[in-house]
Curated annotation (Swiss-Prot):
Residue ranges occupied by any SEA domain in the UniProt entry: 235-349, 900-1013
Organism of origin: Rattus norvegicus
Region (Disordered): 206-234, 431-456, 500-520
Annotated signal peptide: 1-28
Gene symbol of the encoding locus: Impg2
Expressed in which tissues: Expressed in the pineal gland and the outer layer of the retina.
Protein name in the entry: Interphotoreceptor matrix proteoglycan 2
InterPro entries xref list: EGF-like_dom, IMPG, SEA_dom, SEA_dom_sf
Composition-biased stretches (Low complexity): 431-443
Primary subcellular site in the record, as a coarse category: membrane
Region annotation Hyaluronan-binding motif involved in chondroitin sulfate A- and C-binding motif: where it falls in the sequence: 1210-1218
Length: 1241
């Protein structure tokens, strides 16, 4: 249900009045008047949705006025984001505060507009675009609301709501004026000055207020043929309940529906309480009305909510009984609580069933709220009628409004707003002044007319004459036997201070079946100021052409004019020249999507007013509507300088070329001109004149229009064939710096002016759609216009590129050109009101989102064609996304689109399934079965709605009912906003799964993140005993258990002590030490204990002592053995060394020794010592091979023989021999002998 929150609407309006310079006093007086006017209403009327819209709006204003004093004031002087720097002056600080105020107001207004009208959050580009318009002052908040309410997307949402109703019965209009035919007075003698014709829907509240303020201006003098239809039975019943929530504390913030606490509690309450009503037959929805503080005690919160049921679900008798005795309900106990009630309820079991169900949900732990079953009260039950919407179609043959019943309008929507068809007012005769703009700001007169005029008034109050019925339907008989029927759903009021674009119009002369030409009404088009050089051209009418399947576009067969002779010609508009004038039989529509601009000096004008063929053109839908090309042309004018009465001369214009225009609204990041365009009243009763430059006569050319859309079965289509038709392309150039010529050439289907270096604006070509109006794009100074045609039989598009610096601004209307020799083409067009009830396929849209092909910049030397880019935005509809504050504009809007990731993660929670431990184990049968089930459900759903979809991987299941974490892989990079698309698909999947597969998926738990921005660990089932590690190469996340914890069968990490009960033996105690792992604490006795990693070793005290003694003894033995071994080794080494020493000495060495011993008394005194010294060696004489070389190379035997031959005794010989050996073996002794020998010498 789409509705305005009264508080948000009024508060936002007051803020904007400060921003736009409005008068707060007048607003307060108006609100007081409303409050005074509604004082006579009873409380029952204030809650009745069937009351007229005017009364309900007054009630809303009164209720809002009561809530104003409850708003909490700011606790700080300035909000976040506004700071006062010490260096700032007072003026700079004030400017900063105003800038912040504008940004905050625009942010809130944009968010509320998207949520209210389009039921979704804005994308990045569209959010930035609207921020630019709001902050630059191009559009106000109220104008923004009007534009959103006129959009096709808003009406599509309403139409989708209608398709769910079951009864298609007509209903009476009650207090609102409506009927099978709508008519409006035709002004005579006084006309309104406008710049186009359009049909649009205005802000419902504003429309009703204006009509109430000036009712006499919207009353017709003619008797209207209104057929009253009987009131059908109620199609819906709304039951209002009240229940108290225990455990909650009421706060003043719950009075504000826009507060975060209020929204959070509403979502939580609906998600919990809805379970009790889901099982009831005919249940449709539930919404919270308000929260109240309990009167008896201060604890808890009283919730006032309403539940909607189908009309046939509950009998009227039961509802009447419940309504009469709602305060006298007897508690007969809980009867058959486990069984859901049937279609007819009684007083007791209906109330008791709801109360018991809520209580059971709380006891079972399925609810976080604690509703008091005893406090449940049924306050009121009322029936609501569902009126039918009326299909208004355009009829070119008759002038009556033909209304056909096509669908049912939701009752709540009907009660809140005026329906689109009930607020239609039309004007058929106007003075159209395309150049009647003013470059200054909107005047006070324009503001007053805008705010005080009634719904049907445009500028002035004309003199009423017989009404001319507005025909908005086209039958196959009228349109030359064609099978097309176009529909229009949202006509409305013209906003005085906005640029306009045509919505629908007929050709100047309508060709009927009987070959009669119906002359159009007088339409004055004041394009340029008249001058003395203007000469009239006679009126011509083109004879009709009969074709059973074609709609002919008529024009004059030729048009000749000379620029050389006269700079301008006064051309009186013929009825057959659709390019110059037409019968305006439709409303004027505001072109809401481009910033207000003013025009200077130079422009390029493509006349196309009245070039339609009687078909109503769909209303603009800014770039998110799924439709196709639109046919229409519309001139846009500028304020012609009064100083310039003549046009600048042009060197040559070869010929006029016919255009069949198309344009898609592109978000603009710039504001052009000095001020917004607005319309002024102009008294003119003469036929319009349009100066046209032409050098040579042009031959009649054929207009071939092709409309491309997806194939839709059973949809009427039409084709446009070759017909003598001419749309004049008017090029009027003027320059403030130079008065040189501007050459306009048309070569090979291309119209071009001098190119130059680009400045500021990207060149773009847009694909238009049938629900879009042609709009005008203003280029900054120094821009060039290229009109490119195709010679290969395909329609080409216009491209905007740079122009020379000497040129002033150009007004360009993007157009399609087609050579005359091309054959006609026929394509189907999708009707605006067609509602396709199917899963929304956004695969094509995702491929086109953000696909920007940028043209290269041109220098002055480059004159070649410029590459254009095509931007196809997506139509993504998602609801209930969390509010995320997006940044405000930071300069020029960036259109750079980067390639997205190949992986997108998402998770969802299934609430009606119980989790089991086996779902942790990916190898378990239960896991595989559930995984296969979700793959079978999700893969076809995603594959059919996402282009580039490769595969879906179920990562894991987590506890929390059942949380499914998944990963989607794409074959190629996806757009950055693919998250929104997947969120929308999953949200729709939640609804489908609940209705068809009994899977209750909590859509509030949906979480979608792209691979580049997502945290892979977020979608892993890692518990507190593990940590998530991400592979930097593959991006894969994995859970790693902490030391002392293990994962068995991919279950969450658990302690080793729990997984292995026998980890510690002999009654040891297992414990996990953080960072170290599991350890065992072993038992200890008086003289024994256990030890080891798992306490597997037993240790006693005697055993330890014995081991200690044995260890010491063993150590000593080992030490002794080592010492003995070392001694032996040293001794053996000495012996070996003695044997290896040489025994040779000099020949006199022996005699010197003998002389030393013989003649040295000191030596003799020491002889006994030497004998003692050598005594140990006597037993073990040391023989060495070296001793043989000691004495002159004589061996020991030779020395002995020498001594035996002497007189020495045997003892002396032995003694000398020992001395010699000692001398030879002991270096110290040898040194001693030599020392004493030297002393004697």
């Amino acid at each position: 249900m789409i509705m305005f929150l009264p508080l948000g609407r009024i508060s936002l309006g007051i803020l904007i009045l400060f921003l736009t310079g409005g008068n707060l006093v007048s607003v307060s007086e108006e609100i007081q008047d409303r409050m005074h006017a509604v004082a006579v209403l009873s409380p029952k009327e204030s809650t009745d949705l069937s009351l007229p819209t005017r009364k309900r709006q007054l009630l809303d204003a009164t209720e809002t006025g009561r809530r104003w004093p409850l708003r909490r004031r700011r606790s700080i002087l300035f909000p976040n984001g506004v700071r006062i720097c010490p260096s700032d002056t007072v003026a700079e600080a004030v400017a900063n505060h105003v800038k912040y105020f504008k940004a905050r107001v625009c942010q809130e207004a944009i968010w509320e507009a998207f949520r209210t009208f389009w039921d979704r959050l804005p994308g990045r580009e569209e959010y930035q675009y609207w921020m630019n318009l709001c902050e630059d002052g191009v559009t106000s908040v109220f104008e923004m609301g009007t534009q959103f309410s006129q959009s096709v997307e808003h009406r599509h949402l309403i139409m989708e709501k209608l398709t769910y109703t079951k009864e298609a019965e007509s209903s009476s209009c009650k207090d609102q004026a409506c009927g099978p035919e709508l008519s409006s007075p035709v002004p005579i003698g006084e006309t309104s000055t406008l710049a186009g014709a359009v049909s649009s829907a205005s802000y419902p509240g504003a429309a009703s207020e204006r009509s109430a303020a000036s009712p006499q201006e919207s009353i017709s003098n003619e008797i209207e043929n209104v057929t009253e239809q009987p009131t059908p039975p109620a199609a819906e019943q709304i039951a209002e309940f009240s229940i108290q929530l225990l455990g909650k504390q009421y706060s003043e913030e719950l009075r504000d529906p826009s507060s975060a606490l209020y929204r959070l509690l509403v979502e939580e309450f609906i998600s919990e309480v809805e379970k009790a009503f889901t099982g009831l037959p005919g249940y449709k929805g539930i919404h919270v009305l308000d929260f109240r503080s309990p009167k008896e005690n201060g604890s808890g919160i009283d919730v006032h909510y309403a539940v909607t049921f189908n009309g046939e679900a509950i009998s009227n008798t039961t509802w009447d009984l419940i309504s009469l005795h709602s305060n006298k309900v007897e508690n007969h106990g809980l009867v058959e609580l486990d069984d859901k009630p049937t279609a007819v309820y009684t007083i007791s079991n209906f109330r008791d069933y709801i109360a018991e169900t809520l209580h059971q949900n709380f006891l079972m732990g399925n609810s976080s709220l604690n509703p008091d079953p005893k406090s449940l009260q049924l306050i009121n039950v009322r029936g609501v009628l569902l009126p039918q919407t009326e299909e208004i179609v355009w009829n070119t043959q008759s002038s009556s409004l033909q209304v056909t019943t096509s669908s049912i309008l939701d009752n709540t929507l009907q009660a809140e707003w005026l329906s689109a068809d009930e607020s239609i007012t039309t004007t058929t005769t106007t003075t159209i002044s395309p150049f009647g703009f003013s470059s200054g700001p909107p005047s006070a007169t324009g503001r007053e007319l805008h705010s005080e005029s009634t719904l049907g008034d445009i500028v002035s109050t004309p003199k009423l004459a017989s009404p001319s019925k507005v025909v908005l339907s086209s039958s196959p008989e009228v349109l030359g036997g064609s099978s097309l029927t176009l529909h229009s759903v949202t006509p409305a009021v013209l906003q005085i201070d906005l640029p306009v674009a045509p919505e629908g119009r007929t050709s100047g002369s309508s060709i009927l079946e009987d070959d009669n030409t119906e002359e159009s009404e007088d339409v004055s088009i004041d394009v340029l100021p008249s001058s003395s050089l203007i000469q009239p051209v006679p009126k011509e009418t083109v004879p009709p052409m009969e074709d059973s399947d074609m709609i002919l576009l008529t024009s004059s067969p030729h048009l000749t004019s000379s620029v050389i002779e006269d700079l301008a010609k006064d051309i009186t508009t013929p009825s057959g020249l659709d390019s110059l004038a037409s019968r305006v039989s439709d409303k004027l529509d505001v072109s809401p999507w481009f910033p207000d601009t003013s025009v200077e000096k130079e422009f390029i004008f493509e006349s196309g007013l009245g070039s339609g063929s009687g078909k109503n053109v769909d209303v603009i839908d800014w770039p998110w509507s799924e439709t196709s090309l639109e046919k229409t042309t519309e001139p846009l004018s500028k304020s012609w300088s009064e100083e310039q009465d003549t046009l600048l001369p042009t060197e040559s214009i070869e010929k006029l070329h016919m255009y069949f225009t198309e344009q898609m609204i592109e978000p603009s990041a710039h504001r052009y001109g000095d001020g917004p365009i607005y319309f002024t009243e102009e008294e003119s009763h003469v036929r319009s004149t349009i100066p046209i430059f032409a050098e040579s006569a042009t031959q009649p050319t054929s207009l071939i229009s092709s409309k491309h859309t997806s194939d839709v079965p059973d949809i009427d289509s039409y084709s446009v064939t070759k017909a003598p038709f001419l749309l004049a392309t008017i090029a009027n150039t003027a320059s403030t710096k130079e008065t040189d010529e501007v050459n306009t050439l048309l070569k090979k289907g291309m119209v071009q002016t001098e190119p130059s270096s680009p400045k500021g604006l990207d060149s773009k070509i847009s694909v238009a759609r049938p629900d879009m109006q042609p709009v005008w794009t203003i280029l900054p100074e120094s821009d060039t216009v290229w009109a490119r045609t195709s010679s290969l039989g395909k329609l080409s598009r216009d491209t905007l590129v740079s122009t020379p610096e000497s040129a002033d601004r150009l007004w360009l209307k993007a157009s399609m050109t087609q050579p005359a020799e091309l054959p006609p083409s026929t394509h189907s067009i999708q009707l605006e009101d067609e509602v396709i009830m199917a899963v929304q396929n956004i695969s094509l849209e995702l491929d086109q989102v953000g696909t920007d092909y940028y043209q290269p910049e041109l220098t002055q030397e480059q004159n070649g064609k410029v590459d254009s880019y095509v931007e196809m935005p997506t139509h993504v509809h998602y609801t209930e996304m969390p509010l995320v504050a997006q940044p405000t504009k930071g300069g020029v809007l960036s259109r750079t689109q980067t390639a997205g990731a190949l992986v997108v993660f998402f998770s969802l929670r299934v609430t009606n399934m119980l989790f089991s431990e086996d779902l942790f184990n990916k190898n378990s049968l239960e896991y595989k079965a559930l995984e296969q089930r979700f793959l079978e459900l999700l893969v076809p759903y995603l594959q059919s709605n996402l282009s580039g979809f490769q595969n879906l991987e179920i990562l894991n299941f987590r506890n929390g009912s059942i949380v499914v974490n998944s990963r989607v892989k794409f074959a190629e990079s996806v757009p950055p906003n693919v998250n929104n698309a997947i969120y929308m698909i999953l949200e729709d999947f939640c609804t489908t799964a609940y209705q068809t597969m009994n899977l209750d998926i909590d859509k509030y738990s949906l979480d979608v993140e792209s691979g580049d921005d997502a945290n892979p660990c977020k979608f892993q089932a890692c518990n507190e005993f593990s940590e998530c590690l991400v592979n930097p190469w593959s991006g894969e996340a994995k859970c790693k258990c902490h030391p002392g914890y293990l994962s068995v069968d991919e279950l969450p990490c658990q302690s080793v002590c729990d997984l292995q009960p026998d980890f510690c033996l002999n009654d040891g105690k297992c414990d996990v030490m953080p960072g170290h792992g599991a350890i065992c604490r072993c038992r200890v006795g008086s003289n024994w204990w256990y030890r080891g990693q798992h306490c597997e070793e037993f240790v006693s005290e005697p055993f330890v002592i014995g081991i200690t003694i044995a260890s010491v003894v063993s150590l000593l033995l080992v030490a002794s053995a080592v010492v003995f071994f070392l001694a032996k080794m040293l001794q053996a080494q000495n012996v070996r060394r003695e044997r290896q020493r040489p025994t040779n000495r000099q020949p006199d060495s022996l005699s010197s020794v003998e002389n030393a011993m013989k003649y040295n008394p000191a030596y003799e005194s020491r002889l006994a010592g030497c004998e003692q010294y050598e005594k140990p060696y006597s037993q073990h004489p040391f023989y060495s091979s070296a001793s043989e070389e000691v004495i002159g190379g004589l061996s020991r035997e030779e020395i002995r023989q020498m001594y035996e031959s002497s007189d020495l005794s045997k003892e002396e010989i032995q003694e000398r021999m020992r001395i010699l050996e000692l001398y030879a073996n002991d270096p110290e002794f040898a040194a001693f002998v030599r020392e004493h020998e030297m002393e004697e010498l």
